[in-house]
Amino acid sequence: MVIYSINVFAVMSQDIKLLRVKIFDELSKIVDPEINTSIVELELIDEVDISDSNVKVDLHLTSPFCPAVFGFKICQDVHDYLLRVDGVNDVKVNVSNHFMAEQINNQVNNSPNPKKLGELPKKLDEVPKKL
């Protein structure tokens, strides 16, 4: 369960408080595919660190041997859902206590960030002929 000191929360700027609420709203939409329950309800989130527009999420899975495909999906969802939040430009996910943690972290944290790719072409003739 994520626990914050009241004193630390009290000194946070209003913008950071609002961003934290938006982040937890998004995290609560992510469901463990095996149990069909929110990862927030399951208390899988260990820590959320916000620095400017960068977010780092530490989490664990329900079991160290949770099927890797489910672990990857949960972590990728955390990454992708949080990138949709206004005010978040980069997300790093760190899953621990799982037999495939290193591979999952590498794959998720090296996935494309649409906010860094720029705007996609709207028409086929706008696509560059050579990359």
Q: Which ranges hold each PLM region?
A:
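Domain-level signature for proteins that mediate thiol-based redox and metal-cofactor handling
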Residues: V2-L131
